[in-house]
Regions:
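Bacterial signal peptide processing site
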Residues: 14-17
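Conserved SAM-binding strand-loop segment of SAM-dependent methyltransferases
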Residues: 107-120
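A short acidic, Gly/Pro-enriched loop at the edge of an enzyme's catalytic core
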Residues: 120-132
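A short SAM/SAH-binding and catalytic strip from SAM-dependent methyltransferases
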Residues: 130-144
Length: 210
């Protein structure tokens, strides 16, 4: 577990991609640096497509798992305002401090709860979320199937889990989601390097009659 935790901690500190990794090197970066980093990420990753896949709107409650320094979190917060909520989880409290700084600069801090969680636990309360986002994080779980099964308990009826990751992780992510009892609703590749897959919880009756 210590080896796994160290790997996950490194991932959390690096963020969701190389661009986000730069953000964790110093908490004293200028506002201009943060803005340039965000603009580069937005151009490369098209985060509006992730928001669209989540199906969130004003008033929604969404979990951003492994949120890192918040390059995607800011977009989720904008989508759910003025009366929604984003719960941003990570195993590293220091990187969530960077997230807080990014949100404060954007005037979105009041919409986001930062939550430090254990490496192998979702840390989300039951039946409380319209959507759960896993962006470039699911392949690091030692038991992805068990994690996803636990996470489904946090969804409201009709809620969805969205997995976004690099293309070379697609097969593993899809297989784990299927084994966890999730039903694929849609899939897209808004940029050549990443896929977005939308899942809902399969009905218990889907496999047979009464």
């Amino acid at each position: 577990m210590r080896v796994l935790f160290c790997v996950l901690l490194a991932v959390a500190s690096c963020g969701r991609n190389d661009a986000e990794g730069d953000s964790t090197g110093s908490s004293s970066r200028s506002t201009d640096d943060t803005a340039r980093e965000q603009a580069r990420f937005d151009a490369e990753r098209r985060p509006e497509k992730v928001v669209e896949a989540l199906g969130i709107r004003p008033g929604s409650r969404v979990a951003d798992v492994g949120a890192g320094s918040g390059l995607l979190t800011v977009h989720l917060a904008r989508a759910v305002r003025p009366n929604g909520r984003v719960v941003a989880t990570d195993i590293d409290g220091a990187v969530l401090d960077l997230l807080q700084s990014r949100l404060a600069a954007a005037g979105l801090a009041d919409l986001v709860e930062r939550r430090v969680v254990a490496a192998e636990q979702p840390g989300l309360e039951a039946a409380s979320y319209d959507a759960i986002l896993l962006a470039e994080v699911d392949h690091y779980f030692s038991d992805e199937v068990a994690w996803l099964k636990e996470a489904t308990r946090a969804l409201k009826p009709g809620g969805r889990i969205v997995i976004s990751n690099r293309i070379h992780h697609r097969q593993k992510s899809m297989a784990a989601a299927q084994r966890a009892g999730l039903k694929l609703q849609s899939e897209s590749t808004p940029v050549p390097t990443h896929f977005i897959a939308v899942f809902t919880v399969a009905s218990p009756a889907a496999g047979g009659g009464k």
